[in-house]
C-alpha cells in the first residue's frame, strides 16, 4: 500500500488538489446562490417566491450525476466547458438548492416576534432581515450548513464521471494501470476523510454546544 | 420538433421505463434494509453501551464521511476478493444499504436525543425498564420528529442509485445514456425525460412524506 | 482546546482505518485459488458467464428495441460456449474497459470477450486465448475537423478522448506525448463527449470506431491504424483448462467456416472495413 502510494504520489496529490479546488469553488458559489434563493422564497413578492420554490424543488429532485452530465455533453456544445468545470457547476447548482432550504428553515425558526418588532420600530423589510433576522438565523444554520459542506465534498466524486481529474478519477486510472482494485481506493478514502472528518466533528461539537 | 417527439417513441420509452423500474426496485429494497439497520445502529449509538457503541460510532463516522461512489466500488470490486460475490444489482443494494444505514443511524441518534430528558425519566420512574421506555415512549416521539429528514434521505437514496451506472447497473440514467450514445439527436429529449421521471418520482415521495408529517404532528 | 480534540479524533480514526485496511489486504494477496475451478463449474452448472461490451456497435451493443446484447463478440461468446459444453447456456454481463479485469479476477465473470487487446502488461495478470480478431488503433474526429493523423494532435492543448482502462490511452502517450488524455468511463460517454467538443479526437480500435460511424454521420475515421491490436479472450490464470478449451473452440470455428460466417455477418457491409483483414 505504501509503495503504491509513493509510486503514484503525484497523481494522488493532483487529484486531492482538484477535489479541494472544486469543493471550495462550489462551496462559495452554492452558499451565495443558496442564500439568494432562500431570500427569493421569503421576500414579500409572490412571483419571486414561486421562482425560488420551483428552482429548489426541481434541482433537489434530480440526481447530481444527471445535472453534471447535462453540462458536460449538452451545454458544452454551446459553451466550452471541460469536465472539471461541468462537474463544479453541477455541484454548485445541486448544493445551492439544499443550502437554500437550510437557510430558509433557519430564517423561519427565528421567532417571528423579532421580525415584527423590528418592522414596527420603522425598519424596512430588508433592514429587518439584514440586522435582526439573518444574524440569528445564520447562527442556527451553521451546523446543518456544515453538514451540507461535508456532502458537497463527498459529492465532488461525481467529477470522476466526466474526467474531472479529482481523487476518484485518479483512483480509477491508477487502479486500471496497476490492476489493483483495493489499494488506490483505500488511499483516496483516507484523503477524503482528511477533508470530511474534521468538518463533521467540528459541526457535531457546535451542535452539542447549541443544544446545551 | 419531429426529432424531439421521435425520441419519445414507445421503443425508447419502454427501454427507459424498464430502467426506471430497476431504479425503484433497488431503491425500495435499500430503503427497507437501511431503515431497519440504521434504526438499530442509531439506538446502539444513543445507548452508549460500553465498547459496542464506540465501535458502531467509529464505523458510522467513517462511512458517513466517504463518497457513496467509493463505497459502490468497494462492494463491487473489493468484497469479492475476500470471497463475497454479488451481481450488479445486489452489489448496488448492499452499497446503498451500507451508506444509507450510516446516514440514517445518525438521524435516529439525534432524533432520540432531541426527545426531552424528562420523558425518559418519567417513564423510568413509572416502573418501565429502559427498553420498554425506549420502545413505547422515546422511539415513537423521535420518529414523529424525524419524518422530514428521513424522507429527504430516501429521496437522496433514489437519486444516488444513478451513481451505479459506473458499475453498469441498467437503471434509468444508464439507459438514457445508452439511447443518446446510439442516437445523438435524442440527447436533449433524453435529459428532459430523465429530469421529468426523477422529478415525478422524488417529488411524489417528498409530498407523501410531508403529508404524513402533517398528519402525525396534528 | 476543542480544535485539538477534533484533530486528535480525526487522526486517531485515520490511523485505525489504515490499520484495518492493512489487515484486510494481507490475506487477499496470499489467497491462491484452486486450479481449474471455473472450468469444472461450467461443466457442472452448464452456465458460462461472459463479460461483454454493451456500448460498441458491431462488437457488443445493447439493442434498444429488444434490450438484448448483440455483436461479433456476443456471437463468438455464444458459439464458444456451445463448443465447450453443448448443454451450457451463456450468461452475458455488460462490462467496461475499466471494470473487466477486476471482475474476472474477482470471479464475477468466467471469461472476457470484449474488444480486449492482448498486451504484455495484461498477460501478467490474466491468460489470453489465441487472437480471434485483428484490430488496430485509429482516430475518429468530427466531419469538419482537419485532423488527419495522430501526428496532428501531438501539440500542447490538443485533447484526445479515450476510455478508462483501454490500452489506447496508454498508446497515446507514445504517439502523441504532448496531447492531453481525457479518459471517460465508457464508449457511450466518450462518443457523446466528442460530439460536444470535449476533445479534438476520440481514439480507440478501428473496429469500435467503424461501428460508431455506421449510424453517425457527423463523425469520420481518419489516418489509418497506427498500432496493431490483436483481440483475445481473457481467462483467469488459475484456469488453464478453460483457456485451452476456448482455443480449441476458436480453432474448430476457423476450420469449419463458422468463424468466417460470423465475421462476414458483422463486418461485410461496414464502409471502410475489410472483414478478411480483421480476421486473418
Describe the predicted segments one by one:
Chain C
Residues 99, 116-124, 170-174, 193-228:
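A ligand-binding cleft/hinge motif common to bilobed small-molecule-binding domains
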Residues 48-52, 70, 151-165:
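Short loop->beta-strand "edge-of-pocket" segments that line small-molecule binding or catalytic clefts
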Residues 31-36, 43, 167-181, 221-225, ...:
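Ligand-binding clefts/hinges and TM-proximal coupling segments of bilobed small-molecule sensing domains
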Residues 78, 89-152:
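Acidic, polar ligand-binding/catalytic clefts
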Amino acid at each position: 500500500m505504501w509503495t503504491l502510494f509513493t509510486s503514484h504520489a503525484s497523481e494522488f496529490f493532483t487529484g486531492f488538489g482538484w477535489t479541494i479546488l472544486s469543493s471550495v469553488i462550489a462551496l462559495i458559489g452554492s452558499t451565495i446562490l443558496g442564500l439568494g434563493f432562500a431570500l427569493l422564497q421569503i421576500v414579500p413578492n409572490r412571483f419571486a417566491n414561486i421562482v425560488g420554490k420551483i428552482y429548489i424543488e426541481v434541482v433537489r429532485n434530480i440526481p447530481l450525476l444527471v445535472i453534471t452530465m447535462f453540462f458536460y455533453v449538452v451545454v458544452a456544445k454551446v459553451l466550452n466547458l471541460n469536465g472539471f468545470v461541468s462537474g463544479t457547476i453541477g455541484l454548485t447548482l445541486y448544493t445551492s438548492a439544499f443550502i437554500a432550504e437550510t437557510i430558509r428553515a433557519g430564517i423561519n425558526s427565528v421567532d417571528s416576534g423579532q421580525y415584527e418588532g423590528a418592522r414596527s420600530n420603522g425598519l424596512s423589510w430588508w433592514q429587518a432581515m439584514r440586522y435582526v433576522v439573518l444574524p440569528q438565523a445564520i447562527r442556527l444554520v451553521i451546523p446543518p450548513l456544515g453538514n451540507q459542506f461535508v456532502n458537497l465534498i463527498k459529492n465532488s466524486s461525481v467529477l470522476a464521471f466526466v474526467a474531472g481529474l479529482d481523487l476518484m478519477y485518479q483512483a480509477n486510472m491508477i487502479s486500471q494501470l496497476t490492476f489493483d482494485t483495493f489499494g488506490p481506493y483505500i488511499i483516496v478514502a483516507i484523503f477524503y476523510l482528511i477533508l470530511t472528518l474534521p468538518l463533521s466533528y467540528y459541526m457535531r461539537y457546535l451542535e452539542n454546544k447549541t443544544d446545551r | 420538433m419531429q426529432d424531439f417527439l421521435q425520441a419519445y417513441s414507445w421503443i425508447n420509452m419502454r427501454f427507459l421505463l424498464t430502467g426506471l423500474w430497476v431504479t425503484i426496485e433497488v431503491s425500495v429494497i435499500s430503503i427497507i434494509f437501511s431503515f431497519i439497520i440504521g434504526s438499530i445502529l442509531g439506538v446502539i449509538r444513543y445507548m452508549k453501551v460500553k465498547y459496542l457503541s464506540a465501535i458502531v460510532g467509529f464505523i458510522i463516522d467513517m462511512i458517513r464521511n466517504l463518497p457513496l461512489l467509493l463505497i459502490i466500488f468497494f462492494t463491487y470490486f473489493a468484497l469479492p476478493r475476500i470471497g463475497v460475490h454479488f451481481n450488479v444489482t445486489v452489489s448496488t443494494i448492499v452499497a446503498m444499504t451500507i451508506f444509507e444505514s450510516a446516514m440514517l443511524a445518525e438521524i435516529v441518534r439525534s432524533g432520540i436525543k432531541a426527545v426531552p430528558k424528562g420523558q425518559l425519566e418519567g417513564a423510568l420512574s413509572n416502573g418501565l425498564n429502559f427498553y420498554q421506555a425506549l420502545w413505547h415512549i422515546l422511539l415513537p416521539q423521535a420518529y414523529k420528529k424525524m419524518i422530514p429528514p428521513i424522507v429527504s434521505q430516501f429521496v437522496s437514496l433514489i437519486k444516488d442509485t444513478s451513481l451505479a451506472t459506473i458499475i453498469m447497473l441498467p437503471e434509468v440514467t444508464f439507459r438514457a445514456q445508452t439511447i443518446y450514445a446510439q442516437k445523438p439527436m435524442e440527447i436533449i429529449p433524453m435529459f428532459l425525460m430523465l429530469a421529468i421521471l426523477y422529478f415525478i418520482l422524488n417529488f411524489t415521495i417528498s409530498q407523501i412524506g410531508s403529508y404524513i408529517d402533517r398528519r402525525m404532528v396534528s | 482546546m476543542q480544535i485539538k480534540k477534533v484533530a486528535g479524533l480525526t487522526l486517531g480514526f485515520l490511523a485505525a482505518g489504515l490499520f484495518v485496511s492493512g489487515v484486510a489486504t494481507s490475506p487477499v494477496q496470499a489467497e491462491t485459488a484452486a486450479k481449474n475451478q471455473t472450468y469444472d463449474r461450467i461443466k457442472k452448472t452448464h452456465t458460462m458467464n461472459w463479460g461483454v461490451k454493451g456500448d460498441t456497435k458491431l462488437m457488443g451493443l445493447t439493442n434498444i428495441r429488444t434490450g438484448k446484447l448483440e455483436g461479433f463478440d456476443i456471437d463468438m461468446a455464444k458459439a464458444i460456449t456451445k463448443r465447450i459444453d453443448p448443454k451450457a447456456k451463456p450468461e452475458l454481463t455488460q462490462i467496461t474497459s475499466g471494470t473487466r479485469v477486476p471482475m474476472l479476477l474477482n470471479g464475477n465473470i468466467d471469461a472476457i470477450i470484449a474488444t480486449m487487446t492482448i498486451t504484455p502488461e495484461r498477460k501478467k495478470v490474466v491468460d489470453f486465448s489465441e487472437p480471434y480478431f485483428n484490430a488496430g488503433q485509429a482516430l475518429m474526429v468530427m466531419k469538419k475537423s482537419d485532423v488527419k493523423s495522430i501526428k496532428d494532435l501531438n501539440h500542447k492543448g490538443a485533447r484526445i478522448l479515450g476510455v478508462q482502462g483501454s490500452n489506447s490511452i496508454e498508446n497515446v502517450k507514445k504517439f502523441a506525448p504532448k496531447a492531453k488524455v481525457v479518459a471517460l468511463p465508457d464508449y457511450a460517454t466518450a462518443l457523446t463527449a466528442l460530439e460536444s467538443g470535449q476533445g479534438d479526437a476520440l481514439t480507440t480500435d478501428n473496429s469500435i470506431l467503424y461501428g460508431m460511424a455506421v449510424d453517425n454521420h457527423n463523425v469520420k475515421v481518419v489516418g489509418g491504424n497506427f498500432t496493431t491490436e490483436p483481440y483475445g479472450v481473457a481467462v483467469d490464470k488459475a484456469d488453464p483448462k478453460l483457456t485451452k478449451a476456448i482455443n480449441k473452440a476458436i480453432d474448430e470455428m476457423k476450420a469449419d467456416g463458422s468463424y468466417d460466417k460470423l465475421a462476414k455477418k458483422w463486418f461485410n457491409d461496414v464502409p471502410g472495413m475489410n472483414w478478411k483483414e480483421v480476421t486473418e
